[in-house]
Amino acid sequence: MNHRLVALSVASLALLAPLTVPAQGLRPSSATVGAGVLAPARVPAATGLAADYIVAVVNSEPITNNEVRAALQRVLQQLAQQGNPQVDSKTLVRQVLERLINEKAQLQLARESGIAADEAAIDQAEQNIARQNQLTVAELRRRLTQEGGVPGQFRNQLRDQILLTRLREREVEPRARVSELEIDQFLREQQSSTPAVQQINLAQVLVSVPDTATPVQVTALQARAQRALARARAGEDFVTLVREFSDASDKASLANGGELGLRTADRYPPLFLEATHNLAVGEISALVRSGAGFHILKVLEKKSAALPAMTVTQSRARHILLRVSPQLTESAARDKLNEFKKRVAAGQADFAALARDHSQDGSAAQGGDLGWANPGMFVPEFEAVMNSLTPGQISEPLVSRFGVHLIQLMERRQATLSPQEQREAVRAMLHEKKLDEAYISWAQDVRGRAYVELREPPQ
């Protein structure tokens, strides 16, 4: 199962700091930052209080107003690049602060657990970024300084990302192991079930309820959700309601009008399935209360998905992945990949060589080659574009949760899945589901065990 993308399920959308799962075939490096150094966007100066002050304390470590504002700058940049309309500023600031609290608690756990990122690992990450920008390390640092960054802070960010990645891999991955008995049970259930597995695409408005909310605050938030529900059932445009009411932290969900994606039913929370079981396409659910808050669900699509056919069309593709980061905007990544495409089309460059030099995926060493893939092995947005290509054709840059891709389809063939291949496909699916569930539980546990004191609200 080498060289495979593994998608995060919709269950993780309610978290403010979702796990960056090292995908098979798109495995992030210790520092997932890429080409094109960019100065951070500017946010208007804080007023009323001093420019910097403590807004929260996680155990014994403070989070300052400036930290929140710097993180907010990055989020605003990403929202603007995605063409996302304006989001309620108070809601966004609250989400950014909560994300920083979660990350702070996880970083503390990493250090307490003896996880470390030595200078050699950070040096390597910095060298990779410089190489991807076609710069020396000295030139990279000068450019960061010119664009308002601080090289020392940049290295600290790299260190934190390495720590978080190593912690999550150590703590969460073991909880998602799939046994042979689980595979056997799944296959037996599929063979004995008469109806085909259903696939559902939902959109949601999420009015978040903080863990610390008082009964009065919960009542007010429920009333807000009820207003959104009434307008949805009155026929107002759901996308407009998402933009006005939704507190969903997943930026891709907000940009897509709250759409959660076409998934098999078992990849949605049971609460969602219960609320939408008897709804037709286009209908709106009643208010759903979860640990994250109040949800309003709209059924966008329902269809049956039969078990995988014994004979399938396999595709072999290669790709170049550039990861979006504070140093590489989505727009800059698209421009860079478009330039690569032009160079290959003009015979000035080789796709595999470009992948080896620039791709930020584990397949880079193989020239971006992802190997032969069965249907369903890649995330939907990647697979849809790949399936539209003819052998030899190169796609336009496309965005997935992993970053921005340039895909070249190499060849296609008809193949019969062996029993072992079927088992491996089931293993990957069950692992993905368990990984989502394990991360949600783990992240909530880490957050719950931390002492968090909220002070002056950020500005």
From Swiss-Prot:
Catalytic activity: [protein]-peptidylproline (omega=180) = [protein]-peptidylproline (omega=0)
Identification of the protein by name: Chaperone SurA
Entries under Gene3D superfamilies matching the protein: 3.10.50.40, Porin chaperone SurA, peptide-binding domain (1.10.4030.10)
Signal peptide interval: 1-23
Family matches, as InterPro entries: OMP_Chaperone_SurA, PPIase_dom_sf, PPIase_PpiC, PPIase_PpiC_CS, PPIase_SurA, SurA_N, Trigger_fact/SurA_dom_sf
Described function: Chaperone involved in the correct folding and assembly of outer membrane proteins. Recognizes specific patterns of aromatic residues and the orientation of their side chains, which are found more frequently in integral outer membrane proteins. May act in both early periplasmic and late outer membrane-associated steps of protein maturation.
GO annotation, cellular component aspect: outer membrane-bounded periplasmic space
Domain commentary: The PPIase activity resides only in the second parvulin domain. The N-terminal region and the C-terminal tail are necessary and sufficient for the chaperone activity of SurA. The PPIase activity is dispensable for SurA to function as a chaperone. The N-terminal region and the C-terminal tail are also required for porin recognition.
Pfam families xrefs: Rotamase (PF00639), Rotamase_3 (PF13616), SurA_N (PF09312)
Protein localization: Periplasm
Keyword DNA-binding attributed: no
Keyword Ribosomal protein in record: no
